[in-house]
Amino acid sequence: MVHRSCLIWFSLSLVTATVAAAAPIKVLIVDGQNNHAWKETTPVLKTLLEETGRFTVDVATTPPKGADMSSFQPNFAAYAVVVSNYNGDPWPAETVRAFEEYVRNGGGFVSYHAADNAFPEWKAYQQMIAVGGWGNRKEEDFGPMVRWSGGKIRLDANPGICGHHGSRLPFQVTLRDPDHPIVKGLPAVWMHVEDELYDSLCGPAASLTVIATAHSDPANKGTGEDEPMLMAIRYGKGRVFHTTLGHDPAAMRCVGFIVTFQRGVEWAASGKVTQKPPKDFPTATETRVR
Ligand code: ZN
């Protein structure tokens, strides 16, 4: 006969074993060059992931701009997801090949803010991020601009320069795929803090899901279009989450940025989101910061 206290002990051991089995998701942040303050923003990205208790985070930093890049050869395959906070010199050919293979074979990738300005000459990278801006991109060379109208994606083939934003102001973000795991359970419309609202991004725009948009206000030098802010892209077996938000640490304090980033990294890594929507999420009219 088994004593009751032994049974309780056994059950508790099982619970402990189950929790221990949920191994943390391994994340690699890449940085080292950017026209943004990457030395300030990478520690914020790292902390935001670590504070969920679901991730362990390493950082791979490239040599500085203009230096020999041949030493930059991270072992992407050791991670479930790579987050780019990089916008700079081309990577060595071997690293480019390794990264393409990594995502094509099912590795996760997250393009954060100006990472979608990077590598205009790298075709596979443009396919991963779907759309990008600046870097002398023109719509006629890179692919259509992506706008949202009439409840669906509209590919805008008019020629033009890709990548623009007005002054940093608060703006509303509207979910367009509310059942997507990254945003499921979050408010349909929420007020983001002062940030750059990217407009006129262009690219191959293949295998693209627009998760959320924002209206680019002509009164703030905008396009008058609903522009993609959060996107999900398939590249081979890999999942890509593309967030245009988070210009600086102040913009990254928005709970809307924080939560969509944390959930987007988990989704890119695993295809699932286990994080619950928080209680302090912004509403349609009020920002919320942490
Ligand atoms: Zn910016």
Regions found by a protein language model. Give the residues of each.
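Bacterial N-terminal signal peptides
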Residues: 5-17
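Sec/Tat signal peptide C-region and signal peptidase I cleavage site
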Residues: 18-22
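Extracellular ligand-binding/catalytic regions of CAZymes and related secreted enzymes
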Residues: 23-25, 40-41, 51, 74, ...
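Helical hinge/lid and interdomain linker segments adjacent to catalytic or ligand-binding clefts
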Residues: 26-119
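Short, solvent-exposed loop/turn segments at secondary-structure junctions
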Residues: 34-35, 89, 116-118, 188, ...
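Catalytic beta-strand/loop cores that center a nucleophilic Ser/Cys/Thr
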Residues: 50, 56-58, 78, 146-236
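A glycine-rich, often tryptophan-bearing local segment used as a flexible ligand/cofactor-contacting loop or short
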Residues: 89-181
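Structural detector of well-ordered beta-strand residues that form the stable sheet scaffold
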Residues: 106-110, 211, 241
